[in-house]
Each structure stands twice: as C-alpha cells, then as structure tokens.
C-alpha cells in the first residue's frame, strides 16, 4: 500500500513544525520545499534523524525543486512574509498574494489531484487566490482560520475554569483577522453552556483576547509570529482529509450561497473528510451574530478588491 504524500511549502517555523506534526502523527511521507537553498534540506534531515527516537517512519526530504513534490495528496502552503510587531495580517496582503499565486501554479503543475491547505496570511484572501489560480473545485482548497482561532478561545476558557482543554468546544466564524466572530452562544464546557459558568464581562475579555491572539504572540516574539498552534491546527485539518475523519471543524471555506454570501472565503463550520470540505454547516445566527459575520466577510472582500 502506497504511503500518502504531504508537501509543505515554506520551511520557516510554521512549515517545519507542520512537518514535525505530520511525522509524529504518521500521516505519510513529507516533502519540505522552500526557495532558500539548504534550509529545507537541513530541517528535513534533522526531523528524519529524530525518527528513531520518536518512533515514526515517515520519510522526510527537503528540496528547492517542485518536481520533488509530484503526486502529493495534500499540500500545505505556509510560504510568505511573517508578521512583525505593529503589523496586521492585512498588511501582508500585496507581498504574500504574489507568493501564493506562484506557489499554487507550481503545485498544480505537479500535483493536479492534491488538496490545498492555506496558512499564508491574510488567510482568507490567500485561499481565494489559491482557489482561482488552481482551477480546483471549491472542496479542495481551504484555509486555516477557525481551528486556530477556536483553539485560542478554548485555551482561555479552560484556563479560566481550570478544566481540561478537551472539554471546551467552541466555534469562531468569519475572516481570520481582527473582525473574527467567536461564537459564545455555541461554546460549551463539558456540555454546559459557557455563559452559565463565566460572567459576561470575563467572556467579553476572552473574546477580545482571542481576536488579538496572534498579535499578542507577535508582540512577545518581536521578530516572528506564532507557529506551534497554527501548525498543529492545520495538520489536524490535513489528518481529517488523509484519514477521512469527517470531523466538524471551523475552516476558511469558499461560500456559494451559505450564510447569504458567495464568491468569498470565510471561516465557517464544515465537515472535513477524504473529499476535503464535504459540507458547510449553516448555524442559526441571531441578528447581532449575523451582523458581525457580515462585517468580517466584508473585510475579506475589501482586501480581495485591493489585489492587483
């Protein structure tokens, strides 16, 4: 039986950590590709030399040649410029748009049947670019958004209540930016609505912290951005495809009438399985929640309109 093949584009902190998660989860063989000579090769060799210690059997190679990525099942695109203190995800728009377009064209040439998972910020716009550049069906291109944003929100709730992280379930909708919409009404702790456990003012503070979660880490690091949680989140998405897990996850998916929106990517709950985004789930939103989602999606549309 042939192993699955995962290509990770970009050998920076996010990409290399994605490769580590993929190997640790035994998701398949891994290709780490980057324009910088020596970086993907060195990191791939380092990761493979950890295999005897960690007990995985993934073959990991580093390369600068897209021919080595041929016939990939899943491609994770992390390539791009990282945020610096004071920058928003949207500030990266024009720089990263060209990178994502070029990478996508190379990937399609060698892996026409792959699923594309987009991490490059601003994620929702990058996913739109990759979708248009690839010519793939909408189910095969989606971005990291709500899995990461929800993980941050869940972390803050679990720490507030001193309970297991696993017992907190939540969704974050909308674009992966400052207008994201943490869904307090759909947040549960061990099956109990979170609003029954945490006062409103504390919840509002956690919502705001989740929105600024990436910037908080950027401000600490000074010269980089988050990578452990983003890479863990996107590899959870990859695992759902490769193992046909059919989990309901909030991802940046292409909307075709759902939530009254079309021709735009936004974070929404979806069933993720062997066929990628198999179904987008439409939550029953009240007027305030829908208005917040519309505002978030309009921010994504505004950025798309700025593309050259």
From Swiss-Prot:
GO terms for biological process: lactate metabolic process; tricarboxylic acid cycle. Keywords: NAD, Oxidoreductase, Tricarboxylic acid cycle. It comes from the Bacteria. Its EC number is 1.1.1.37. It catalyses: (S)-malate + NAD(+) = oxaloacetate + NADH + H(+). It is an enzyme of class 1 (oxidoreductase). NAD(+) binds at residues 10-15, 34, 96, 119-121. SUPFAM superfamilies: LDH C-terminal domain-like (SSF56327), NAD(P)-binding Rossmann-fold domains (SSF51735). CDD domains: LDH-like_MDH (cd01339). Substrate binds at residues 83, 89, 121, 152. The keyword Thylakoid does not apply. The active site is at residue 176. GO terms for molecular function: L-lactate dehydrogenase activity; L-malate dehydrogenase (NAD+) activity. Belongs to the LDH/MDH superfamily. MDH type 3 family. Catalyzes the reversible oxidation of malate to oxaloacetate. HAMAP family: Malate_dehydrog_3 (MF_00487). This is Malate dehydrogenase.
